[in-house]
Amino acid sequence: MLNVNEYFAGKVKSIGYDSGSIGRASVGVMEKGEYTFTTDRPEEMTVVTGALRVLIPGAPDWQVFTPGETFFVPERSEFNLQVAEPSAYLCKYLS
């Protein structure tokens, strides 16, 4: 089953799904902007297109991730994103 989500007045949209090979995940696109997300479970985020500038909890500085690069976000945390151009991502929800 697909779940469509929209955040930040439509600037971030995602489609969530359950996959036998990777478990629960979502794919989405972020428009240019700055965003703060919270997590319940640990997440693995992979950039598909564009670039994401991310401030991960516990990291001393912002980091830039480009297509094919992955970052991890701890459970029950908050992370910040700066997006300079429309960017796509794959998010895997880890247990």
Curated annotation (Swiss-Prot):
Keyword terms, alphabetized: Glycosyltransferase, Transferase
Record InterPro entries: Ppnp, RmlC-like_jellyroll, RmlC_Cupin_sf
Recorded catalytic activity of this chain's protein: a purine D-ribonucleoside + phosphate = a purine nucleobase + alpha-D-ribose 1-phosphate; adenosine + phosphate = alpha-D-ribose 1-phosphate + adenine; cytidine + phosphate = cytosine + alpha-D-ribose 1-phosphate; guanosine + phosphate = alpha-D-ribose 1-phosphate + guanine
GO MF assignments: guanosine phosphorylase activity; purine-nucleoside phosphorylase activity; thymidine phosphorylase activity; uridine phosphorylase activity
EC number(s) from the headed UniProt entry: 2.4.2.1, 2.4.2.2
One cellular component (GO) term of this entry: cytosol
UniProt KW Repeat keyword: no
Similarity field: Belongs to the nucleoside phosphorylase PpnP family.
Stated role: Catalyzes the phosphorolysis of diverse nucleosides, yielding D-ribose 1-phosphate and the respective free bases. Can use uridine, adenosine, guanosine, cytidine, thymidine, inosine and xanthosine as substrates. Also catalyzes the reverse reactions.
The protein's name: Pyrimidine/purine nucleoside phosphorylase
Gene: ppnP
